[in-house]
Amino acid sequence: EQSEVFFDAIGEEATFKDWSREFRVREPELVDNTLSEPLRECWGAIESAAEGIEDETKRNELMDGARRLRELHGGIKLFLDQEDEDSVYWIEKGGNEGTSLSLNAAPVNVASLLRPILFGPDKSCIATSATLGTGDDQLRYFRERVGAEHVPAVKIGSPFDYQKQMEIYVIKSMPDPRDDDYEKMLIHWIERVLIKTEGKAFVLFTSHRLLRSVAEEMEDFFDEHGWTLLAQGSGMPRQKMVETFREDINSVLFGTDSFWAGVDVPGEALSNVIVTRIPFAVPDHPLTAARLEEIEAEGGNSFMDYSVPEAVIKLRQGVGRLIRSKKDSGMVVILDNRVVTKRYGKTFLAALPNAPVKIVT
């Protein structure tokens, strides 16, 4: 009951904009901390009960529960007090209906935190990933972000022969994503490309709304060809979607953020990755907005110094879904003409795998 009262008060103070799931909290003490004492009483009662239990397993389980309550107590206090001026605080709606609320806090810049922990003079640390770079062999962007400015960087070549295994197509004739006819042309090109590979594709979106709209408009297309459409947000768990995609050889998966990275589908099942839009981070997300503000305050260019490098890394992750072994092959299609029409587009092209690139006009 106390929890409901507390989060009802949080919900009344959070004024979410249309389509937004985040509300940035800029001042401390948004609401009264009515959970402080109930949580304290609860973990105290659990600890007292645990002291009288001889069974070690049961006693440890109770003590672990008490520890989690103490952590919740500390987290709520941290959020409401906002004592760390170098962090950003926000409330986020969760669940399909957006009915659950979570309290969030994160440091705007992690470099000062990680530098002494991982990269100090008496520390030994190796940071490795296939997508740390933004086209810069010295990995300068990553090193500055994590406080490893003075750490040597090594770029190791790929074991894959991208010249033979991958083809990249950039559709220059696509309208700007902000134009009214963008969605219509997006559907046109997705259909055209899917026919070429008979499905077997990941279609990567940056917007849940656009994904749902395109999926709805293309229902007849998929029925006509007898291909299964797996659309994120339809109720199927992520892992189940991936398993179904692997088993259904001509299926097509529409995914957003969580499908740009961390998904492996080697073999013929994935022969085509379609990128609907450059994956720029939403600039009004509280954490992104705070980082952009910090860069501008220090005299930097927030778009080129943060938005572009972050999007380059995510694009590389998305494109990287295609080739997962030396036996894989296929095509990547980018349906965002900004990679060839905007000055910053060359940064994206330079960061892509060394595969043949064809500009479709």
Predicted stretch roles:
Residues E1-T361:
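ASCE RecA-like P-loop NTPase motor cores
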